[in-house]
Amino acid sequence: VAALGLVHVPEGRRIFPRLTVEENLEIGAYLENDRKVIQERKEQVYQLFPRLYERRQQKGGTLSGGEQQMLAIGRALMQNPRILLMDEPSMGLAPVLVDFIFEIVQKLNQEGRTILLVEQNARLALQVAHRGYVLATGEIILYGPARELAENPEVQKAYLGEG
């Protein structure tokens, strides 16, 4: 699936705690054999997340939750995915880091990547999404343009704490 351009950023980050930041990133490029391409991708990740560059020799397990989320996203980007599946990227993060992660999601999308975002923070998800789907007990109950969903009274009451 990764070879087809579909890469997953899992819920709970699932980094390799005993490997360094740099080693975690390199594992993300496991399908790439060209060391120059791998280095270029690492540099792109470090530009997106300068904190990871500062911590590149640090073990992944010693990073904060926000840094681990950056690493999980960076590892996925090492595959140069066309479609990025992100599962609960804001889970367990401080509000300032949640905002930063969502800024990165928007930036990646603006650069041409398709992002499928599963997120319980409906307000932020609808702010960055083009389209939204509301699920209840595994069934799609509402869908449409994100702005329309954000303005829907049912969605506002049930998921956005309004009304």
Q: Model segments located where?
A:
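ABC-type ATPase nucleotide-binding domains, specifically the catalytic core motifs of the NBD
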Residues: 21-40, 48-53, 57, 144, ...
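Catalytic Walker B motif of ABC-type/P-loop ATPase nucleotide-binding domains
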Residues: 84-88
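Conserved ABC ATPase signature
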Residues: 59-63, 67
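Helical segment within the ABC ATPase nucleotide-binding domain
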Residues: 98-111
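ABC ATPase C-loop
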Residues: 76-77
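Short, glycine/charged-rich "phosphate-handling" switch motifs in NTP-dependent
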Residues: 131, 143
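Conserved catalytic motifs of ABC-family nucleotide-binding domains
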Residues: 80
